[in-house]
Amino acid sequence: MKLGVNIDHVATLRNARGTSYPDPLKAAEIAIDAGADFITVHLREDRRHIRDEDVFNLKKSISTELNLEIAATEEMLEIAKKVKPYSISIVPEKREELTTEGGLDIVNMHSKLSSIIEEMHSSSIKVSLFIDPNIDQLKYLEKLGTKPDIIEIHTGDYCDNPSEKKLQLITNAAEYVNKLGIECHAGHGITYEHAKKMTRIPHISALNIGHYLISEAVFYGLHSVVKTMKMTMSN
């Protein structure tokens, strides 16, 4: 199972004082050296953490794949076409939220998402959609004219208040996505304990983890916590 390390909150710390440090690129390099399989950043419309120049620097400099999380807006899609990351992940976005609060509403967005996927594929960019583990939403993937390359299952509800029932919803969602022939990732709120459970779910091929790793890095160092997470996932 692959580990994608989200380094947004390195930029949050930098922006808190308006300094040039800590540098997200340095964090990415450390994470990669410790075993991260790819790097994820979320370029939000309000630029509250990652900025445009961070994304371009990362694409130019890192040795692994870059996954760029963005909202489904014309501005962000144009930036993606200029950056040309390995993949983009379309996420819902509200200015007032502290973090992404849920998955995309595919029921009401399937035609828009189809055109976005087609547009990105024409620029050789893979597309991931961030979706709740809700089969009623996932069924609408079959209505998409062009299929996404990846579905990332939103694990926040489970991670905030774990239960076997919620874990089963994630398991069922991953199985459904796999039957459609789409790669399945998972992310949001994942800790070491959650990761142990996620690695037992068939069909999930990668986890995206950010806030927890950066928080633990304050006490134990980024290299150490990324390495520990990789070991946790491989066990």
UniProtKB/Swiss-Prot annotation:
Residues that coordinate or bind 1-deoxy-D-xylulose 5-phosphate: D8, H9, R44, H49, T99
Site (Transition state stabilizer): E152
Keyword Transferase: yes
One BP term from GO: pyridoxine biosynthetic process
Gene3D superfamilies named among the record's database cross-references: Aldolase class I
Keywords, ordered alphabetically: Cytoplasm, Pyridoxine biosynthesis, Transferase
One Gene Ontology CC term in the entry: cytosol
InterPro entries documented for this protein: Aldolase_TIM (IPR013785), PyrdxlP_synth_PdxJ (IPR004569), Pyridoxine-5'_phos_synth (IPR036130)
Cell compartments where the protein resides: Cytoplasm
The keyword Transferase is assigned to this record: yes
Enzyme class: transferase
Catalytic residue positions: H42, E69, H188
Role summary: Catalyzes the complicated ring closure reaction between the two acyclic compounds 1-deoxy-D-xylulose-5-phosphate (DXP) and 3-amino-2-oxopropyl phosphate (1-amino-acetone-3-phosphate or AAP) to form pyridoxine 5'-phosphate (PNP) and inorganic phosphate.
NCBIfam families, per the entry: pdxJ (TIGR00559), PRK05265.1-3 (NF003625), PRK05265.1-5 (NF003627)
Protein name per its UniProtKB record: Pyridoxine 5'-phosphate synthase
The organism of origin for this protein: Wolbachia sp. subsp. Drosophila simulans (strain wRi)
Gene: pdxJ
